A protein has these predicted regions:
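Helix-turn-helix repeat elements of alpha-solenoid scaffolds
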Residues: 1, 18-32, 59-75, 99-113, ...
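Residue-level recognition of tetratricopeptide repeat
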Residues: 15, 50, 55-57, 96, ...
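Short coil/turn linker motifs that delimit alpha-helical repeat modules in TPR/alpha-solenoid proteins
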Residues: 2, 9, 22, 41-44, ...
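Alpha-helix C-terminal capping/termination sites
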Residues: 19-20, 57-63, 97-100, 138, ...
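Residue register of alpha-helical TPR repeats
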Residues: 8, 46-50, 89, 127-129, ...
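Amphipathic alpha-helical segments of tetratricopeptide repeats
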Residues: 31-38, 71-79, 112-119, 150-158, ...
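Structural signature of alpha-solenoid helical repeat junctions
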Residues: 5, 42-47, 86, 124, ...
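TPR/TPR-like (Sel1-like) alpha-helical repeat modules
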Residues: 146-157, 173, 184-201, 212-221, ...
């Protein structure tokens, strides 16, 4: 084997330093990689875009230039490897930057570019729908927020990101418990029948009790693995759902673990 085979490439070392939290050394190495990359006859444009993205996120460039740098990375990856995991990640990072800059509509537009039609992986599509749902919820546009959170829950469940799927289920349930109607279409039916809208609105929809049950089961299965902790919003939501749709078995499942519960709010509710 050649020396090239036995020595790990600098980009791999860069990744290792990042994962170990050694930011200073990673940034030093990244400057060397970018310098060498510019001098190579065959530049690795994908690695270059990835490293520039990481540098922007780590604060290695002026804050005023971060947005432009992240946009450059998205455009470069879109031209050389559209639909790749790295392209999807670059879009997520750009959307996050827009959201943090209070540019919510730009964040939503950017997140919409992550899709199965574009060839992005299921887990990144799920994460993008979760972010879209959160932004729409913040705006108060709850009908599409609920659809996005539901799609995110389904996508992340199917890609074995169970912790993230639970987060989606919780955020969906928190909205859904405000308005329940047995005659309401299920979320799957709403997603199938969804049509593009000309402009955002402040819409709300009632939820179907069957969807409430599905989301609670996802949350409960995870929550019962360990019920300790001082702030257990997941268990609190389940108790709310148990009362609102009159499903005592969920409360009973939590009551069986009462001695392990530490959240004072839950202890008070369970004593009432």
């Amino acid at each position: 084997s050649t020396a090239k085979d036995t020595n790990p490439p600098d980009s791999l070392l860069f990744q290792t330093l990042l994962s170990e939290g050694n930011t200073e050394k990673a940034l030093e190495l990244s400057e060397k990689i970018l310098e060498e990359s510019r001098n190579l006859a065959e530049r690795d444009f994908e690695a270059e875009a990835w490293i520039r993205m990481e540098r922007a996120l780590l604060g290695a460039i002026e804050p005023a230039n971060v947005g432009n740098e992240l946009r450059w990375c998205v455009d470069r990856l879109a031209s050389i490897n559209p639909g790749s995991p790295l392209h999807g990640l670059a879009l997520l990072n750009l959307a996050s930057w827009h959201r943090n800059s209070n540019e919510r509509m730009m964040a939503l537009v950017t997140l919409a570019d992550i899709s199965s039609d574009a060839g992005h992986p299921v887990d990144l599509i799920g994460l993008s729908r979760l972010e879209s749902g959160r932004i729409l919820s913040l705006i108060g546009d709850l009908e599409p927020a609920m659809r996005h959170l539901w799609m995110a829950m389904r996508r992340l469940s199917s890609s074995e990101m169970s912790a993230e799927a639970v987060v989606c289920a919780m955020e969906w349930l928190d909205i859904a418990l405000d308005d329940i109607d047995p005659d309401s279409p299920t979320m799957d039916e709403r997603i199938l029948g969804a049509k593009p809208r000309e402009k955002p609105g402040m819409t709300t929809i009632p939820s179907n009790p069957n969807d409430i049950k599905e989301s609670v089961e996802i949350i409960l299965t995870n929550a019962l693995k360990d019920v300790s902790g001082d702030h257990r919003d997941d268990l609190g939501l389940i108790l709310d759902a148990s009362e609102i749709i009159e499903e005592p078995k969920w409360r009973e499942a939590i009551e069986e673990r009462r001695s392990e519960i530490q959240d004072p709010r839950l202890i008070e509710v369970l004593q009432s």
